[in-house]
A protein has these predicted regions:
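Domain-level detector for secreted/extracellular nuclease and nuclease-toxin modules, and
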Residues: 14-303
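C-terminal motif of bacterial Sec signal peptides marking the signal peptidase cleavage site
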Residues: 9-13
Length: 303
């Protein structure tokens, strides 16, 4: 297995806006971006939280942001593969965020086994007995299929902090040609990424609902949360500017082949209301407001 390069941080404030985490360390609030994440003493001045794909970090409680980095900078100038917000009290992943562009496609697929992040989490911050979810698949939030350009990046997607329990009928296939609604959403996102020009990028934040009892199906053995809903916040940057949309679906134990992706597509603003998460907070406020309030299905082929 490839050696992992990991970093962890725990808090966030507000600040400057950068695509790749090279923003200011001053901690000053950009007047054009009042809700952005800001590197500070509390989070070790970690610049990764200023990347475009990041949402606003949750305040209160005990959270850790785990930034999974590659040794190579061939695919990302800062070596970032994907990042996770981990709730240490709930012992659950809140979201995974990452970038997609043409450079992430290659020949490597499912090169690793599942493993725990014992480097960044202490024994009381995760349930180590749940290496397998009885009755559920281990659902990658950053999929293995989105990281096929190198063995190292693919192997990192198998860390258990990047997993949520998902029904096989929601995130799998069968021999009769059925495919889960969630996996169809992921496949569509991958198709959009495959059509990007060499200078275009898709920014993604995905996860399941863990913050409200009404949005939880159950707890495995009374412990591990099974989210009732799953979502994707999607931001595309191209020569035409920014476009945004989101997917939202309840998790059920049925194939739902008659349901279209369009019926689960919403604006990012609506997704924020449903999740309580401020997505793409590192965009300038005027750009963020425009792309989040509008969902134009005509610019998203395949819906």
């Amino acid at each position: 297995m490839a050696v992992l390069m990991l970093s962890a941080l725990t808090f966030s404030a507000c600040g400057d806006d950068e695509d790749g985490g090279n923003g200011s360390q001053s901690g000053q609030v950009d007047k054009k971006n009042k809700n952005a994440n800001v590197p500070s003493a509390a989070n070790g001045y970690n610049k990764a939280i200023q990347r475009r794909e990041f949402p606003a970090l949750k305040q209160g409680g005990k959270q850790k942001v785990l930034v999974y980095r590659m040794k190579s900078t061939a695919y990302d100038k800062d070596g970032v593969n994907f990042s996770v917000e981990w709730d240490c009290n709930k012992r659950s992943q809140r979201w995974t965020c990452y970038q997609m562009h043409r450079g992430y496609s290659g020949k490597y697929s499912r090169v690793s086994n599942f493993y725990f992040d014992t480097t960044n989490l202490t024994a009381d911050e995760y349930y180590d007995e749940f290496n397998y979810f009885p009755g559920y698949d281990r659902g990658h939030i950053c999929p293995s299929g989105d990281r096929t350009a190198s063995e190292e990046m693919n192997a990192q997607t198998f860390v258990m902090t990047n997993m949520q329990p998902q029904y096989h009928q929601f995130n799998g296939y069968d021999d009769s040609g059925n495919s889960g609604l969630w996996v169809r959403m992921e496949n569509q996102l991958r198709k959009w990424a495959d059509k990007l020009s060499v200078t275009d990028t898709i920014f993604v934040c995905k996860g399941g609902t863990i913050d409200s009892e009404a949005n939880i199906i159950t707890r495995i053995n009374g412990k591990l949360i099974v989210p009732k809903y799953f979502y994707m916040a999607i931001l595309r940057k191209s020569s035409f500017g920014y476009a945004g949309m989101a997917f939202w679906s309840d998790q059920t134990k049925s194939w739902r082949m008659n349901e279209t992706l369009h019926s689960h597509a919403i604006s990012i603003s609506e997704l924020e209301k449903r999740t309580g998460i401020d997505f793409f907070c590192n965009l300038p406020d005027d750009v963020e407001a425009q792309v989040e309030k509008t969902f134009n299905s005509s610019v998203w082929s395949g819906l």
